[in-house]
UniProtKB/Swiss-Prot annotation:
It is an enzyme of class 2 (transferase). The keyword Cytoplasm applies. It is found in: Cytoplasm. [4Fe-4S] cluster 2 binds at C181, C185, C188. It catalyses: N(6)-dimethylallyladenosine(37) in tRNA + (sulfur carrier)-SH + AH2 + 2 S-adenosyl-L-methionine = 2-methylsulfanyl-N(6)-dimethylallyladenosine(37) in tRNA + (sulfur carrier)-H + 5'-deoxyadenosine + L-methionine + A + S-adenosyl-L-homocysteine + 2 H(+). Its main location: cytoplasm. Its cofactor is [4Fe-4S] cluster. Gene3D superfamilies: Methylthiotransferase, N-terminal domain, tm_1862 like domain. The gene is miaB. GO terms for molecular function: 4 iron, 4 sulfur cluster binding; metal ion binding; N6-isopentenyladenosine methylthiotransferase activity. This is tRNA-2-methylthio-N(6)-dimethylallyladenosine synthase. InterPro entries: Elp3/MiaA/NifB-like_rSAM (IPR006638), Methylthiotransferase (IPR005839), Methylthiotransferase_CS (IPR020612), Methylthiotransferase_N (IPR013848), Methylthiotransferase_N_sf (IPR038135), MiaB_methiolase (IPR006463), rSAM (IPR007197), rSAM_horseshoe (IPR023404). The lineage of its organism: Bacteria, Pseudomonadati, Pseudomonadota, Alphaproteobacteria, Rhodobacterales. One of its GO terms (cellular component) is cytosol.
Length: 462
């Protein structure tokens, strides 16, 4: 096996299909399967671009592919086992085509490393999230019959070593502005799989944003494991996320900006103000709190209290009263009592969420919480999850029902399942269905909401 760094010198799954960048003799087929967060979606796009320069054209199914790449997530329990199960399902394809190349990327690749190849010898390549710019060099080794492994945290900026993206775009795009996390929440593997917080330069981000707009993008979502910790070099100084958003808002043709995911402790005054004074910044915010009990928040190493979080939400809503708030919650964290869980329910009642995601705690190897006593039983955690989800679903339903009769601006992205139907996103990130022509794709149109459904809204063009 070759470790490339030593020889080179240089969120549910989403399947992504891209039009490849221009390259001669595109004869090889690449299938990418993406698990986990939006950043993995962005990373998959860039990996496909990097391999496009090696003659790979992306396809929508693994059958008939010359290379299959699994871009993995390590946040939830059994993520590694799910990956191994998927690799097992690929065995018949390798048996049918011995020349098929199989690679594993992402956070499970970072965490498991060489163990992946030991357990599944059919894997040719393992690459971490900080080194996928080295994929072309790794493929040289693979094509020579070697195994290739690279899970370094290199000093060089991977974004400087990737080809310029040339794929045709839809009207929305992700743009990674920051990677890694320094918060070290007791339950989280991100600091170990993504590394320390690193911000990209403002100049390069502005250039990439302009390029996206030139290729048809009207809405950009800025990504980071802790995106509001962004502090990138710009104009001889340092830009925070608010400055970056305001400067991007000046780009002609960029109508909408979002960002995710944030930590409450990095919600600076200027970023709060931007929610009120920057119309291009959409009234949607994903701001996880994880728990409502101060005891559990301290055990999680969140470094804020429930009251701190509630005051912060009040300030943001003062700046943007129509804000659609989203959050994350973990139930069954070690040491959580029924009283602690009730504090979480109380916080949800106090704050009110338009959307939220809740999970049972799952011990991640190598994290402080995994070694703690007081683990909550599976039955109790499941019961708490059901009760929390019932409350959050009630709030989401009420928020969606309140949209009926209102007019919203929808950026249309794609046709719906039914003929003559188009689907887009409102300012509040609601999925909105209308009857309309395909020419709506990429356009922003006013829609009056007529009906609220489980996870979407329907309306009519105004």
């Amino acid at each position: 096996m070759i470790e490339v760094s030593a020889v080179a010198g240089y969120t549910p799954s989403v399947e992504i299909s891209l039009t490849p960048r221009e390259a001669p003799q595109m004869t090889k087929k690449l299938f990418v399967k993406t698990y986990g967060c939006q950043m993995n979606v962005y990373d998959s796009e860039r990996m496909a671009e990097a391999l496009g320069g090696e003659g790979y054209e992306q396809v929508n199914t693994p059958e008939g592919a010359d290379m299959i790449l699994l871009n993995t997530c390590h946040i939830r329990e059994k993520a590694a086992e799910k990956m191994y199960s998927e690799l097992g399902r690929l065995r018949p394809l390798r048996d049918a085509n011995p020349d098929l190349k199989i690679g594993v990327a992402g956070c499970v690749a970072q965490a498991e490393g060489e163990e992946i190849m030991r357990r599944q010898p059919l894997v040719d390549l393992v690459v971490g999230p900080q080194t996928y710019h080295r994929l072309p060099k790794m493929m040289e080794a693979v094509n020579a019959g070697e195994k290739a492994l690279d899970t370094d945290f290199p000093e060089e900026d991977k974004f400087l070593n990737l080809p310029k993206a040339r794929a045709t775009r839809g009207p929305t795009a992700f743009l990674t502005v920051q990677e890694g996390c320094d918060k070290f929440c007791a339950f989280c593997v991100v600091p170990y799989t993504r590394g320390a917080e690193v911000s990209r330069s403002a100049e390069r981000l502005m250039a990439e944003a302009r390029d996206l707009v030139d290729r048809g993008v009207r809405e950009i979502t800025l990504l980071g494991q802790n995106v509001n910790a962004y502090h990138g070099a710009g104009d001889g100084g340092t830009w925070g996320l608010a400055r970056l958003i305001r400067e991007m808002a000046k780009i002609d043709g960029l109508d909408r900006i979002r960002f995710t995911t944030s930590h409450p402790n990095d919600m600076e005054d200027d970023l709060i103000a931007a929610h009120g004074d920057c119309p291009e910044l959409m009234p949607y915010l994903h701001l996880p709190v994880q728990a409502g009990s101060d005891k559990i928040l301290k055990a999680m190493n969140r470094k804020h209290t429930a009251a701190d979080y509630i005051r912060l939400i009040d300030r943001i809503r003062d700046a943007r009263p129509d804000l659609h708030l989203s959050g994350d919650f973990i139930v069954g964290f070690p040491g959580e009592t029924e009283e602690d869980f009730q504090a979480t329910l109380d916080l949800v009642e106090t704050v009110g969420y338009g959307t939220a995601y809740s999970f049972k705690y799952s011990a991640r190897p190598g994290t402080p919480a995994a070694e703690r006593t007081g683990q909550v039983s599976e039955a109790e955690a499941s019961d708490r999850l059901q009760r929390l989800q019932a409350l959050l679903t009630q709030q989401q339903r009420a928020a969606q029902d309140a949209m009926v009769g209102r007019r919203v601006k929808v950026l249309f992205e794609k046709p719906g399942r039914n003929p003559g139907q188009m689907i887009g996103k409102s300012e509040y990130l609601h999925s909105v269905h209308v009857d309309g022509p395909d020419t709506l794709r990429g356009q922003i149109a006013e829609v009056e909401i007529a009906e609220s459904k489980t996870n979407s809204l329907t309306g009519r063009l105004v």
